[in-house]
């Protein structure tokens, strides 16, 4: 099913990873063997700890992967615009409620039958969306929240407040189950679109009748600081990427103007006997010189921004960022006769990749 990350300091030191509490990308899934129903049941999570003092709500983080394309394919390809935009101070995201059959959520249910799926939501993040402060709180305060990545065309980051779980890039299928009272903080989204399925797991009638203790949740101050730093870093990266796209659009326009002015000056020189206005030619040449200066300035500024983005983006994420920039440039419309200008001036040979 997955693995559990207890939030006790002694337990956090265990495992094959470095002592750092920040989780890296998930490893490549291993080939699964066929297991019996009993074995499969034993692999499932347990959200209640049975002690001499009674049932205690666990304060652990459960991390696993799910075959989301098989289970939730219709939600991944859904391009409807019925999401509700939440655009507040330090928070921007799109959300809508959805109905998901319980059978598709079996992987996040506990083996003891103490919790059931209640409400489900789709959260969509676009470039620049996310949380710089605060978190998303959904579901029962005495329950758990399952966060499942259905789609990620960009660089998505996630932090479970008060814990050591910080993910710099969530992959499709990644699943994290945590206490609902902690919330989920989606770090600023870089590049393409991401969609998450949020499942609220509430106590069942059986558990409520049995009774259980809700302990105070622990807190990791160092992780809070790390998450804040990572959030600010991602904001800077987004700003530099936006500047890079803007420079690229301005550069295209400058090349276009340069080409048109040069063609006009050539026309004037070709018909020198007819066009005798030397002042006109001087004005055109002056405009050409100004345009060339702008091009040089833009190229220099672009090189600086590329260097900055390279220093901020993880090496394995550069292709994602490059593809996003290329897509944004193509979608911006640009000037007319773009292909002709680009080809004639070899603009496509300029190095805009990170």
Swiss-Prot record:
Disulfide bond residue pairs: none
Pfam families given in the database record: Pox_F11
Coiled-coil blocks: none
Job of this protein: Stimulates increases in peripheral microtubule dynamics and may increase the motility of the infected cells, contributing to cell-to-cell spread of the virus. Seems to inhibit the signaling via the GTPase RHOA and DIAPH1/mDia.
Induction: Expressed in the late phase of the viral replicative cycle.
Name assigned to this protein: Protein OPG055
Similarity annotation: Belongs to the orthopoxvirus OPG055 family.
Entry annotated with the keyword Mitochondrion: no
Keywords: Late protein
